[in-house]
Amino acid sequence: MSAKDSMAKEYFADNARFADLCNNILYGGREVILPENLKERDTTEVLTALGLNKKTIAMQKLRDIFKNASIKYTGKSYVVLIGVENQSDIHYAIPVKNMFYDVMAYGNQVKETAKKHRREKDTATSDEFLSGFTKEDKLIPVITITVYLGTKEWDGPRRLSDMFGDVDEELLPFIPDYRINLLAPREITDFTGFRTSIRQLFEVLQNAYDKEKMQEVLQNDENFSKVDRETVEAINLFAGTDIDIDEKEEVIDMCKAWEEQKNEGRELGREEGREEGREEGRISQAKVTALKLQKKGHSIEDIAECVEFDEETVKKWLVS
């Protein structure tokens, strides 16, 4: 597992950030899904099926994050399963990948329900017995959210049909489609709905390609004056920044850190310029001295030792 994969899983597994992410994608920023109403689920999806030789085939996929969400909204209570798939790079087959996760999650629900009925022997008809599922049984809806953590614009498919070639239009109504739920930083137009520091992460990712815009965001958004350590670490990793983090600090003033970094860069540039100037002066003086010594009849070896440069360099000076 790469450093980016590990960081993304740990970062968004936090219930407060997970809820914030889901509320912005699913409810337009309204605080409907609460952190305390989220429960971890096993991220391993395992589904078995019979192969052509009647042997059981087991398929296994590992999700990034998968949680059970209990939602109370509009006077009603709901339960939904929400998975988050993090992408640091564009995935050009993401609809198939996510659809497979969802199908396996539904398949597991049917499998567990069938086990329960076999154990309790409570199916009423042969159809229900063969299905392992009764007319009264219900599935828990599954939602998968794709979080793109790159700085480029997303140019990958957004639905299964985007991956098709030419298709007879008369057939389209009979072909099930699948749409991904994508969060891409470059496409966010309003950050005010975010309540956690994922806002700062997405704002930086949106502007990472333009240093002037990045500077403007950091100077004008006071939210960057207090950013938690984990978010700054995520920003450094995904946006490619190099914000200094004091080991003793849990909250970082990114505005100040960014300005200090710029100043250090300017000072380093000036120092390098001074060093370069000093070196050029030393070489120029050495050339003058070498020519004088040559006129006096000194050997190349003696001249090189005197000006403290190698003999090959001195030879080039004297023949040019």
What residue spans do the PLM features occupy?
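Elongated, amphipathic alpha-helical interaction scaffolds
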Residues: 1-320
